[in-house]
Swiss-Prot record:
It comes from the Eukaryota. This is Doublesex- and mab-3-related transcription factor 1. It is found in: Nucleus. Residues 1-13 bind DNA. The gene is DMRT1. Residues 52-75 have a biased composition (Low complexity). GO terms for molecular function: DNA-binding transcription factor activity, RNA polymerase II-specific; metal ion binding; RNA polymerase II cis-regulatory region sequence-specific DNA binding. Its main location: nucleus. Keywords: Developmental protein, Differentiation, DNA-binding, Metal-binding, Nucleus, Sexual differentiation, Transcription, Transcription regulation, Zinc. Belongs to the DMRT family. GO terms for biological process: cell differentiation; sex differentiation.
Length: 101
């Protein structure tokens, strides 16, 4: 079950990266360059109350601070994918506030 969750999260990340790469080639979604690299925060909320946070730093390309939210069906738990400018350098995150749709 946990392996399936991870595979779903990885699939969502790959799909998001492909979409961003396509939009970057077209020059649609990334008109504003940011100086620092953006971090991809994926927070998963399980029904048991335990949350799993995957932190992955994307390549330092130009990106905007638009928020992309992907939510799955409620039975699988909520999954939020958000692009934010990197506040901390590629370090470990202690705790993040809950993301609410």
């Amino acid at each position: 079950s946990l392996i399936a969750e991870r595979q779903r999260v990885m699939a969502a990340q790959v799909a998001l990266r492909r979409q961003q790469a396509q939009e970057e080639e077209l020059g649609i979604s990334h008109p504003i360059p940011l100086p620092s690299a953006t971090e991809l925060f994926v927070k998963k909320e399980n029904s048991g109350g335990s949350s799993c946070l995957l932190l992955e730093s994307s390549s330092p390309t130009h990106s905007t601070s638009t928020v992309t939210t992907v939510s799955t069906s409620p039975s699988e738990g909520r999954m939020l994918i958000q692009d934010v400018p990197s506040i901390t350098s590629r370090g470990h995150l202690e705790s993040t506030s809950d993301l609410v749709v």
